[in-house]
């Protein structure tokens, strides 16, 4: 069996094929990237309708390229619900699966594309 390099692996294979879902008990929510602010910060529109300032942590900054219009999983900070940090970036196939499961409404994806 051939071992694939990181360059050829699929993004979903990192988690064993499971897509991480939002969990309100853990303080995670799904958001869409609206714009970059610079300095590893971005503005994201979340499913609850709130615009939040999101930080990209160092472990993702070097591995994952986040652009405007991407759907991300955000962990909210305990001391400020207006800020958070990126936990996971969903790929296009994963976003389609989330829409099929009913986790993300199709209207949210359409509204996000209009904002950009």
Swiss-Prot record:
<dbReference type="InterPro" id="IPR001253">
    <property type="entry name" value="TIF_eIF-1A"/>
</dbReference>
<dbReference type="InterPro" id="IPR012340">
    <property type="entry name" value="NA-bd_OB-fold"/>
</dbReference>
<comment type="similarity">
    <text>Belongs to the eIF-1A family.</text>
</comment>
<comment type="function">
    <text>Seems to be required for maximal rate of protein biosynthesis. Enhances ribosome dissociation into subunits and stabilizes the binding of the initiator Met-tRNA(I) to 40 S ribosomal subunits.</text>
</comment>
<dbReference type="Pfam" id="PF01176">
    <property type="entry name" value="eIF-1a"/>
</dbReference>
<protein>
    <recommendedName>
        <fullName>Translation initiation factor 1A</fullName>
    </recommendedName>
</protein>
<feature type="domain" description="S1-like">
    <location>
        <begin position="17"/>
        <end position="91"/>
    </location>
</feature>
<feature type="region of interest" description="Disordered">
    <location>
        <begin position="1"/>
        <end position="25"/>
    </location>
</feature>
<dbReference type="InterPro" id="IPR006196">
    <property type="entry name" value="RNA-binding_domain_S1_IF1"/>
</dbReference>
<dbReference type="GO" id="GO:0003723">
    <property type="term" value="F:RNA binding"/>
</dbReference>
<keyword id="KW-0396">Initiation factor</keyword>
<keyword id="KW-0648">Protein biosynthesis</keyword>
<dbReference type="GO" id="GO:0003743">
    <property type="term" value="F:translation initiation factor activity"/>
</dbReference>
């Amino acid at each position: 069996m051939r071992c694939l390099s990181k360059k050829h692996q699929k993004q979903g294979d990192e988690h064993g094929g499971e897509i991480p879902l939002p969990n309100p008990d853990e303080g995670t929510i799904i958001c869409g990237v609206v714009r970059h602010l610079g300095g590893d910060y971005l503005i994201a529109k979340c499913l609850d309708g709130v615009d939040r300032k999101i930080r990209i942590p160092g472990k993702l900054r070097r591995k994952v390229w986040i652009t405007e219009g991407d759907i991300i999983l955000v962990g909210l900070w305990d001391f400020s619900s207006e800020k958070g940090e990126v936990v996971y970036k969903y790929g296009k196939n994963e976003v389609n699966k989330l829409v099929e499961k009913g986790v993300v409404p199709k209207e949210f994806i359409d509204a996000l594309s209009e904002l950009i």
